[in-house]
From Swiss-Prot:
GO terms for cellular component: chloroplast; mitochondrial large ribosomal subunit. Keywords: Chloroplast, Plastid, Ribonucleoprotein, Ribosomal protein. This is Large ribosomal subunit protein uL16c. Gene3D superfamilies: Ribosomal protein L10e/L16. Part of the 50S ribosomal subunit. It is found in: Plastid, Chloroplast. GO terms for biological process: mitochondrial translation. Belongs to the universal ribosomal protein uL16 family. GO terms for molecular function: rRNA binding; structural constituent of ribosome.
Length: 135
């Protein structure tokens, strides 16, 4: 699963997801892509599950690019712990995704295969997405 090798700080504020994505909203590498339509945190497990499903469907010949990276730590407090005594420990990593962001790209396969693979990946994502073609 994806996570940063090292960060300057162990913990982050949650922040808020306002507006749309101005960066990473165009197809750069492949021909087909999966684009987010809603804001969400996408965990490294979800990203990895999508990547595996895509590679399994594309087989050989196709190339895949994962355009998001989980760089935000999410802290969780132990269960049945009283309030106070600091912030919880980092438990997992998420990528902050805004509407318009490209999640995955692929090329080297026919459109019907790409549609099938990307629809399977879309079902693994916690948000509404759309299939787009470059050009």
């Amino acid at each position: 699963m994806l996570s940063p090798k090292r960060t300057r700080f162990r913990k982050q504020h949650r922040g808020r997801m306002k507006g749309i994505s101005y960066r990473g909203n165009r197809i750069c590498f492949g021909r087909y892509a999966l684009q987010a339509l809603e804001p969400a945190w996408i965990t490294s497990r979800q990203i990895e599950a999508g990547r595996r499903a895509m590679t399994r469907n594309v087989r050989r010949g196709g190339k895949i690019w994962v355009r998001i990276f989980p760089d935000k730590p999410v802290t969780v407090r132990p269960t049945e712990t009283r309030m106070g005594s600091g912030k919880g420990s980092p438990e997992y990593w998420v990528a902050v995704v805004k509407p318009g962001r490209i999640l995955y790209e692929m090329s080297g396969v026919a459109e019907n295969i790409a549609r099938k693979a990307i629809s399977i990946v879309a079902s693994k994502m916690p948000i509404k997405t759309q299939f787009i073609i470059s050009g």
